[in-house]
């Protein structure tokens, strides 16, 4: 996965950029 290292709050993977996934544990993309 190619994920920009930008901390974005998320509630689902679609909130994240590129190939990021939403890390439900901390509520941020990663």
UniProtKB/Swiss-Prot annotation:
Family annotation (InterPro entries): Prot_inh_squash (IPR000737), Proteinase_amylase_inhib_sf (IPR011052)
Keyword Ribonucleoprotein: no
Annotated positions for site Reactive bond: 5-6
Organism: Luffa aegyptiaca
Compartments, record wording: Secreted
Keywords: Disulfide bond, Knottin, Protease inhibitor, Secreted, Serine protease inhibitor
Record has Cell cycle as a keyword: no
Domain notes: The presence of a 'disulfide through disulfide knot' structurally defines this protein as a knottin.
The organism's place on the tree of life at top rank: Eukaryota
Pfam families according to UniProt: Squash
Record-stated family: Belongs to the protease inhibitor I7 (squash-type serine protease inhibitor) family.
Protein's job: Inhibits trypsin.
One Gene Ontology cellular component: extracellular region
Intrachain S-S bonds: 3-20, 10-22, 16-29
Entry's Gene Ontology molecular function annotations: serine-type endopeptidase inhibitor activity
Gene3D superfamilies in the cross-refs: 4.10.75.20
Record's protein name: Trypsin inhibitor 2
